[in-house]
């Protein structure tokens, strides 16, 4: 039987039969009631038919109806795939091994494309295409060079595949000397490969890709990554549509290829991720049966079992939730048997749909995507009926159905629907936010080579928004909605599935001067995502249909009084749930209530002071302490003098470059705990520039392994020099004494005294002070080690205002140790005896951080500080100790700076620990 025109059913090829009305509805009491329900169902049928074309799901509420239609479509696809694959495979060997230097080739449009070879690990190694009514086959490696060697066993199967390409029937032999045009790959090797498969090709001696006359006389076009043509994807598709079969072989190893991506797109296929098969080394084993291969190919990307669950409502009810675990307020259920498999299946579906979002492709405008459209419409209909909160155990069916629907969002479309209830993410006023009826022009400055920045507008739920950018130079641009990380939805916590699971959208690609229409069920803050940019360049963004949230954009050196006045007016209007602030090197994406509360309570409503301190007391304070090269800001004279005396480069923008823009999410939940580091970092309390938690989380982004004692044992300690410094400064400059019991000098001293009494004093102190691996163990005691050096440096320089300079110098030191020319600079950095740059491990068993601190502090203070490190139970390597000995500095007797305050340094008392353990000097 010929399989040449076996295309999968789609909107273009078939008027799909409608699903029957569910039987249980017909059993409802009363003929009139039943008739009314039937009429309603018919109306939903009509809405569904229209939505399959337009994407407008705003009136579609019957998710069961959509699921039935989806099930029919998935079954049609499975049957058609089964017929095609069964005819191709026959009883031939399934063995195929492309090796590590190969790429995956994935079906993109499931109605018209399918896997040909699926490895044992589930990776698609070759795919078939019926796109545009044609026939195509694509491999993730140049299989034509392998048929006489590593993949000789595959030759018979390739022969049948080529016969199907050329004749539409895998059993129909190709004619002798059938013309083959080879483009973008070695011609001789390609033709010899076809001969190795038992075929008899002849060189067409022309380019069927670019020459229509050649295409009309050729029987097969073989393409490799070296092919080129204007509008390559469109040209490939046109050749398919004209009836020219195409065989593509990826010739770029495990690397991605722009050319390959365009060719595959023309075939309705897509290239795998970076690295391809390099890590998985997937293959089809010789033991694979024809039945199994047909089963895998028929179900790939469709998950008929999941569809059946949805149709029947047969959600699993026996998950063992006792296996869930909780940590700092967030429950995870990774260890629940069976749950991971379910989650992975949903992730596969999400990935397939997000691939279209990322490429800014509207599924409702692409042929061959009926099943994917139905998935989107089913999820849209489910969202119409979501009610929060839900609980994994008490609301089993609703929970799992929502879990699946949350993963399925089509953003790129002309019309869609709003999710009526958004839970803890946003209230009803977000649904009713007015949007612009005309195009707005916004100019954005890109502060770094890559990152993202607030556009200053937001999408309203369910409303169409159009966005385009003008020439962005060499920068690659995308648009995204929202900035929350997935952990900000605490679905596994008891009754806390109370907001959508994926508030942050995928990055949606933008091309210069090409409008992209977006509809989000949730709405959200718009972000411009960029890479390959020139820092400081501007981009013009044109948006239509956007809503305006309170947005404060402070431009350095400009009068911001009007911007602040407008921001205050927008806050006072109380018409938005979210706001954004862009000021200097920080961007805040926050719930209005979390910022407004802090401004009113902590700043007496003074927005200008709040913004000033956000920059100066919070962000700039931390970056200055860490010694970064801040534009238009010189280092203090004391720091400059220390750098010059040692021959250090402390001003290089390459060595000491500022981090990119720091983003802050201020929301109901964080990725982890109440605050969670990263960029963005998350916090759940009101944003306060003087707050401890703000600088604690920012400090996590600035802490480095070379300044950690015992690696991770000070993971929650070394970051705290930033809030400690800020609190010291706030007391000194503003007279406000915050967090004054953070540093536990007294207990640190007691632990040291007890440890020193053992036969091995260093081991005794280590056991008491550093051995506990708990994340927050002995936090205040361990902090006391870091403040010792502030007090020591202040005494050494006889200037209390210089005390914190020691940590600035240590940051400047470690970046030069990390990045500067080693041989040229190691002596100036105090590493003269080290032939190689030292390690940089953050492991608790490593001494890398201990060593660097010992060397850096000894080198800066011009004293041998080994006694004090031993006093604190800090082990260092023989190499580090030998280096300190080589300095020839006088030994600094062990010391301990005692205090009964955290921020007030005038009360500090120095204890000489070299002759024993003096009495604690405070009551």
Curated annotation (Swiss-Prot):
The keyword DNA-binding does not apply. The active site is at residue 697. NCBIfam families: ImpA_fam_HExGH. Belongs to the peptidase M88 family. Its EC number is 3.4.24.-. Pfam families: IMPa_helical, IMPa_N_2, Peptidase_M60. Gene3D superfamilies: Peptidase M60, enhancin-like domain 3 (1.10.390.30). InterPro entries: IMPa_helical (IPR041549), IMPa_N_2 (IPR040711), Pep_M60_3 (IPR042279), Peptidase_M60_dom (IPR031161). Keywords: Hydrolase, Metal-binding, Metalloprotease, Protease, Secreted, Signal, Zinc. One of its GO terms (biological process) is protein transport by the Sec complex. Zn(2+) binds at residues 696, 700. One of its GO terms (cellular component) is extracellular space. Proteolytic activity is blocked in the presence of EDTA. Protease that degrades several proteins of the host immune system. Cleaves P-selectin glycoprotein ligand-1 (PSGL-1), leading to its functional inhibition; PSGL-1 is a leukocyte cell-surface receptor essential for leukocyte recruitment to the site of infection. Next to PSGL-1, targets host CD43 and CD44 that are also involved in leukocyte homing. Thus, prevents neutrophil extravasation and thereby protects P.aeruginosa from neutrophil attack. Is also able to inhibit the decay accelerating factor (CD55), but not the cell-surface receptors CD46 and CD31. It is an enzyme of class 3 (hydrolase). SMART domains: M60-like (SM01276). It comes from Pseudomonas aeruginosa (strain ATCC 15692 / DSM 22644 / CIP 104116 / JCM 14847 / LMG 12228 / 1C / PRS 101 / PAO1). This is Immunomodulating metalloprotease. It is found in: Secreted. Residues 1-41 form the signal peptide. It comes from the Bacteria. Its cofactor is Zn(2+).
């Amino acid at each position: 039987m010929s399989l040449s025109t076996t295309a999968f059913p789609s909107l273009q090829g078939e008027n799909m039969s409608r699903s029957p009305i569910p039987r249980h509805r017909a059993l409802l009491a009363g003929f009139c009631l039943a008739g009314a329900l039937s009429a309603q169902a018919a109306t939903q049928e009509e809405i569904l038919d229209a939505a399959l074309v337009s994407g407008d799901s705003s009136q579609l509420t019957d998710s069961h109806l959509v699921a039935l239609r989806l099930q029919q479509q998935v079954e049609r696809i499975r049957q058609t795939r089964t017929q095609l694959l069964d005819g191709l495979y026959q009883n031939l060997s399934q063995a195929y091994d492309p090796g590590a230097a190969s790429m995956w080739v994935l079906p993109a449009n499931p109605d018209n494309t399918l896997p040909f070879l699926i490895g044992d690990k589930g990776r698609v190694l070759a795919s078939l295409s019926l796109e545009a009514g044609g026939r195509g086959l694509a491999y993730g490696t140049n299989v034509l060079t392998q048929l006489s060697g590593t993949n000789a066993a595959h030759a018979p199967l390739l022969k049948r595949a080529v016969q199907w390409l050329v004749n539409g029937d895998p059993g129909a032999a190709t004619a002798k000397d059938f013309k083959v045009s080879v483009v973008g790959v070695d011609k001789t090797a390609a033709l010899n490969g076809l001969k190795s498969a038992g075929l008899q090709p002849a060189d067409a001696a022309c380019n069927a890709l670019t020459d229509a006359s050649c295409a009309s006389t050729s029987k097969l076009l073989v393409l490799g990554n070296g092919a080129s043509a204007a509008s390559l994807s469109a040209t490939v598709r046109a050749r398919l549509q004209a009836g020219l079969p195409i065989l593509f072989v990826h010739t770029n190893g495990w690397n991605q290829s722009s050319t390959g991506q365009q060719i595959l797109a023309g075939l309705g296929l897509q290239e795998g991720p970076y690295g391809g098969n390099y890590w998985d080394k997937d293959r089809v084993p010789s033991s694979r049966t024809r039945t199994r291969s047909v089963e895998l190919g028929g179900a790939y990307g469709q998950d008929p079992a999941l569809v059946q669950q949805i149709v029947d409502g047969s959600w699993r009810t026996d998950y063992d939730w006792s296996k869930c675990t909780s940590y700092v307020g967030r429950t995870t259920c990774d260890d629940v048997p069976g749950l991971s498999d379910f989650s992975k299946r949903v992730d596969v579906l999400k990935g397939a749909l997000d691939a279209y979002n990322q490429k800014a492709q509207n599924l409702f405008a692409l042929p061959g995507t009926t099943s994917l459209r139905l998935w989107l419409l089913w999820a849209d209909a489910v969202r119409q009926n979501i009610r929060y909160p839900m609980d994994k155990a008490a609301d089993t069916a609703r929970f799992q159905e929502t879990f699946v629907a949350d993963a399925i969002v089509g953003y790129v479309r002309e019309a869609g629907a709003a999710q009526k209830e958004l839970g803890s993410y946003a209230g009803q006023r977000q649904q009713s936010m007015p949007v612009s009826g005309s195009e707005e022009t916004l100019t954005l400055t890109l502060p770094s080579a890559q990152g993202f920045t607030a556009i200053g507008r937001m999408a309203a739920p369910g409303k169409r928004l159009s966005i385009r950018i003008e020439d962005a130079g060499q920068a690659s641009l995308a648009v995204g909605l929202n900035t929350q990380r997935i952990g900000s939805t605490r679905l596994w916590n008891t009754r806390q599935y109370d907001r959508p699971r994926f508030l942050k959208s995928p990055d949606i690609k933008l091309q210069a001067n090409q409008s992209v229409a977006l509809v989000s069920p949730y709405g959200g803050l718009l972000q411009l995502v960029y890479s390959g940019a020139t820092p400081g360049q501007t981009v013009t963004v044109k948006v239509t249909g956007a809503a305006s949230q309170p947005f404060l954009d402070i431009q350095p050196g400009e009068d911001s009084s009007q911007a602040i006045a407008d921001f205050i007016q927008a806050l006072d209007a109380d018409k938005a749930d979210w706001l954004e602030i862009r000021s200097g090197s920080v961007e805040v994406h926050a719930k209005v209530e979390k910022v407004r509360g802090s401004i009113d309570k902590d700043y007496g409503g003074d927005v200008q002071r709040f913004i000033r301190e956000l920059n100066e007391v919070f962000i700039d304070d931390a970056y200055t302490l860490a010694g970064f090269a801040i534009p238009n800001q010189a280092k203090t004279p004391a720091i400059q003098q220390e750098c010059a005396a040692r021959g250090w480069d402390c001003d290089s923008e390459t060595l000491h470059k500022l981090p990119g823009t720091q983003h802050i999410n201020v929301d109901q939940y964080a990725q982890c705990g109440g605050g969670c580091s990263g960029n963005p970092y998350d916090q759940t309390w009101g944003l306060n520039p003087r707050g401890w938690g703000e600088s604690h989380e920012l400090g996590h982004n600035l802490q480095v392994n070379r300044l950690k004692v015992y690696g991770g044992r000070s993971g929650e300690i070394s970051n705290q020099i930033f809030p400690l410094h800020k609190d010291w400064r706030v007391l000194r400059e503003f007279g406000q004494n915050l967090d004054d019991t953070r540093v536990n000098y007294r207990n640190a001293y007691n632990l040291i005294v007890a440890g020193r009494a053992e036969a091995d004093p260093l081991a005794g102190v280590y056991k008491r002070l550093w051995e506990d691996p708990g994340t927050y163990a002995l936090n205040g005691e361990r902090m006391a080690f870091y403040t010792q050096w502030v007090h020591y440096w202040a005494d050494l320089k006889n200037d209390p205002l210089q005390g914190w300079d020691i940590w600035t110098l240590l940051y400047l030191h470690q970046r030069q140790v990390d990045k500067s020319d080693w041989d040229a600079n190691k002596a100036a950095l105090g590493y003269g005896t080290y032939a190689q740059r030292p390690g940089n491990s953050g492991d608790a068993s490593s001494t890398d951080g201990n060593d660097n601190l010992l060397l850096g502090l000894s080198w800066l203070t011009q004293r041998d500080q080994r006694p004090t490190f031993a006093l604190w139970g800090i082990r260092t390597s023989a190499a580090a100790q030998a280096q300190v000995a080589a300095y020839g500095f006088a030994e600094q007797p062990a010391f301990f700076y005692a205090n009964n305050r955290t921020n007030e340094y005038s009360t500090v008392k120095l204890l000489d620990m070299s002759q024993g353990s003096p009495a604690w000097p405070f009551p």
